[in-house]
UniProtKB/Swiss-Prot annotation:
Species, as recorded: Candida albicans (Yeast)
Catalysis: reaction(s): (2R,3S)-3-isopropylmalate + NAD(+) = 4-methyl-2-oxopentanoate + CO2 + NADH
Transmembrane segments: none
Site residues by UniProt (Important for catalysis): 146, 198
Gene assigned in the entry: LEU2
Cited InterPro entries: IsoCit/isopropylmalate_DH_CS (IPR019818), IsoPropMal-DH-like_dom (IPR024084), Isopropylmalate_DH (IPR004429)
Chain positions recorded as NAD(+) binding sites: 82-93, 295-306
UniProt EC number: 1.1.1.85
Name assigned to this protein: 3-isopropylmalate dehydrogenase
Entry superkingdom: Eukaryota
PROSITE patterns, sorted: IDH_IMDH (PS00470)
Function: Catalyzes the oxidation of 3-carboxy-2-hydroxy-4-methylpentanoate (3-isopropylmalate) to 3-carboxy-4-methyl-2-oxopentanoate. The product decarboxylates to 4-methyl-2 oxopentanoate.
């Protein structure tokens, strides 16, 4: 059996980020054992990012971390930020924005579903409202207002003005539309596509809508796309989330907001993974950065954070970047079994610690893989 070595750059980041990256690396080490599919080895390279990097080097993304990421098969990130670093000139979040831009991670993929039906009762919405919710948000990640021209208050002549310009090009919208279409076509039948914008107000949204229509009609005629204003979609997501089941495609800022809104539907931010991709995963080898949806949670006690979002991010990495589809399925099943067994952290009304949940998932995925040998 041949050995495939995958190099993973690990960027713990700040606060709980330093804890949660230990659990997926533990689980991936468990998967290293021979399986009926292939022999895998992981080579983990740890580097600083965010506030920890600022404290150590003065910058939120040191050159060695960026170079390691560029030379790796994938990047696993914890979380960045915290009140210690405030909103000063040098901020932890700048490291995240820079690595996205430098690695051309133009598409952020965030699912919103229930890892197990046993979690339905934990949703802040009624179980009968959220049951069956299964949507994937495809967010454009390196364009729009976050990367547009800007003027800070202190840069204006009267010190009373600050602005950003939300800008999109046809090429930027075209490639994110193709990503959404690819994701839709991975299902049989293909999933519907919802495009969220503010075309009744913003010129950039009108270009967005026109381009999405053109790409879908000319390149993917078998797919359907419906347009929804972002404010209306935000209401629908709470009133009737299953209506938006399918693929949601939207711009950088709108995606930032709507994906966070969607992330609370399953009951905890600690459940949902995220992948930021630099290319279509059409050969299951798309380079990307994988991270949980939640932030650095600086107020959370040690060993109390839910590691499942980060572990499922590693599962996405196995599927999309490393061509380990069977291992991904085994890991997702292991997460479901552990949740159903009642081994849960406090955010899921459990009493288990971060490491206990990680240990249980590592042990369970090992058993599942051995059963298939």
């Amino acid at each position: 059996m041949s050995v495939k070595t995958q190099t993973i750059t690990v960027l713990p980041g700040d606060h709980v980020g330093t804890e949660i990256v230990n659990e997926p690396t533990k689980v991936l080490k468990a998967i290293e054992a021979p399986t009926p599919y292939q022999k895998i080895q992981f080579d983990f390279k740890h580097h600083l990012i965010g506030g920890a990097a600022i404290d150590a080097t003065g910058v939120p993304l040191p050159d060695d971390a960026l170079e390691s990421a560029k030379s790796s098969d994938a990047v696993l990130l914890g979380a960045v930020g915290g009140p210690k670093w405030g909103t000063g000139t040098v901020r932890p979040e700048q490291g995240l924005l820079k690595i996205r831009k430098e690695l051309n991670l133009y598409a952020n993929i965030r699912p919103c579903n229930f890892a197990s039906d046993s979690l339905l009762e934990l949703s802040p919405l009624k179980a009968e409202v959220v049951k069956g919710t299964n949507l994937i948000i495809v967010r454009e990640l390196v364009g729009g207002i976050y990367f547009g021209e800007r003027q800070e208050q202190e840069e204006s002549e009267d010190h009373q003005t600050a602005w950003y310009r939300p800008k999109y090009t046809v090429d930027e919208v075209t490639r994110i539309t193709r990503m959404a279409a690819f994701m839709a076509l991975q299902h049989n039948p293909p999933l519907p596509i919802w495009s969220l914008d503010k075309a009744n107000v913003l010129a950039s949204s009108r270009l967005w809508r026109k381009t999405v229509d053109k790409v879908i009609s000319e390149e993917f005629p078998a797919l359907s796309v419906q347009h929804q204003l972002i404010d209306s979609a935000a209401m629908i997501l709470i009133q009737n989330p299953t209506k938006l089941s399918g693929i949601i495609i939207t711009s950088n800022m709108f995606g930032d907001i709507i994906s966070d809104e969607a992330s609370v539907i399953p009951g905890s931010l600690g459940l949902l993974p995220s992948a930021s991709l630099a290319s279509l995963p059409d050969t299951n080898t798309a380079f990307g950065l994988y991270e949980p949806c939640h932030g650095s949670a600086p107020d959370l006690p040690a060993n109390k954070v839910n590691p499942i979002a980060t572990i499922l991010s590693a599962a996405s990495m196995l599927r999309l970047a490393l061509d380990c589809v069977k291992e991904t399925e085994a890991l997702e099943e292991a997460v479901k079994q552990v949740l159903d067994s009642g081994i849960r952290t406090a955010d899921l009304r459990g009493t288990s610690s971060t490491t206990e949940v990680g240990d249980a998932i590592a042990e369970t995925v090992t058993k599942i893989l051995k059963q298939n040998t």
